[in-house]
Amino acid sequence: MPFLIMLLFVGAIGFQVSFVSRSTTWDMSIAGWVLTGVFILYTAFGLFSNRLPSQMADIIWLYGTATSFSKVVYSVLFFSVTWKALLWIISAIFGDVLIVLLSGDHINLLGRSIIFVGLFFIAEVWLMSVSCARTVKKMKRVYVLVFLLMLGIYSICLYRFFFLQHSSGIWESIARFISGVGLVFDTLSPLYVVVFIGIITVSFMTIAFTSRQVEMKESLVKEAEFWEEFQERQFGSGQIIQKPKTTWWGLQGLNGIWSFLWLELLLFKKYLFFHSIHTVMLSGVFYVVIFMYPEWFYLLFFLIVSAVMLSSYYSGIVRHSQSGTLHLFPGALWKKIIILELTNTVWLYILYCVSITFMAVGNLVYWYIYGLGIYIWFMTIRLFAFTHTNRNDIKLSLPQYYKSFFMALGLSGICLYVIHLLTADWYTLVVVVCIGSLSWCLFYRFR
């Protein structure tokens, strides 16, 4: 945990120094569109994820305590806002000190961070209110309708304002309002003060209303029952011989080495709507980037790959290993690891191939092989981080995992860069990556 806190702290300081320090040169209209988009994303996160206690032990405590449920919600909200605000303010102080030491200038990042803390507060309160609303059916329908309405209006305005380069009537007024949100970093007009106060008021009213509903606690009980059943399946379903079952899509069940994928499919079924929306939105973003802003494609793809890489600790392989299913279910360990990693990451390579095809680049076969080499390198780092950590720490603690992860990433990156300097040929680099990764997998198989 200290390692993760240090990583977040260093990242926050870097963001403050490299990005927030230049806030006076920002295009405030673009900042307004970004802030509005983030607000809509927060609404989606609140609708599709639970920010409230969801473990059975927590639910039992909630039913047995004399404390009102609204106080529990406010406590969770207070903790979420406090640690993020402290991280941001302290990183701003260190950023100011760093800039003064390096350049002698005083930019006052601390003063600017107050604005971000206020935006954090509004976003977190709204996120908690939406998460509370999802536990009550009628409120959930209202918020889903609000989310779809905001997403639709935002998409239409974005298309008309940036792609058609003109808008008229009500769309122009809405686009001007969205662009004006970015002015909070400069001057705060009374209109946006009223809007922000309105969002906070609606959020607290939603929290107060839903926390008094019995349906909210019942929904949390169902959530806790699901995770309790999920854990029981993980710990209690490691039988070598299993009878064929029928899956929820009507085909024969997964047996043998594929049996542990039942748990992944169970989670996929639970969040089917979220995954569908995620796929549609990601496809839409890539369509816009490829055909309208192709120069941004590599940055977008790099950010997605980086997010998947850095979140590898929460992937299926670590989760199954910690629960025991990776070792209890039938099949060779290395086969189960490879199958599980492929099912969790192969979509990245498919997305890369489809995107490259639509971008109409020359010599597609070369770029497919190039992408395959990078994908194998990507897989190798994840496999090394897991196996090295599992060998030294059977509990797979987060700090130990990321130490192995960054060690593999750094050493392999240095080796690849040296090879690139010596050969000056990216094709040679890809071949080396493929052969080296294949050799590593073979050595692990016959170790």
Swiss-Prot record:
Spell out the subcellular localization from the entry. Cell membrane
What lineage does UniProt assign to this protein's organism?
Answer: Bacteria, Bacillati, Bacillota, Bacilli, Bacillales
Q: Which organism is it from?
A: Bacillus subtilis (strain 168)
Give the source's domain of life in one word.
Bacteria
> Which stretches are Cytoplasmic in the membrane topology?
1-3, 51-59, 105-113, 161-189, 269-297, 361-363, 424-426
Q: What is this protein called?
A: Putative bacteriocin-SkfA transport system permease protein SkfF
Phenotype when the gene is knocked out: When the skfA-skfB-skfC-skfE-skfF-skfG-skfH operon is deleted, increased rate of spore formation; a double operon deletion (sdpA-sdpC plus skfA-skfH) makes spores even faster.
Q: Which gene encodes it?
A: skfF
Q: Where are the transmembrane segments?
A: 4-22, 30-50, 60-80, 86-104, 114-134, 142-160, 190-208, 248-268, 298-318, 342-360, 364-382, 405-423, 427-447
**What disulfide bonds does the UniProt entry report for this chain?**
none
- Keyword Membrane attributed: yes
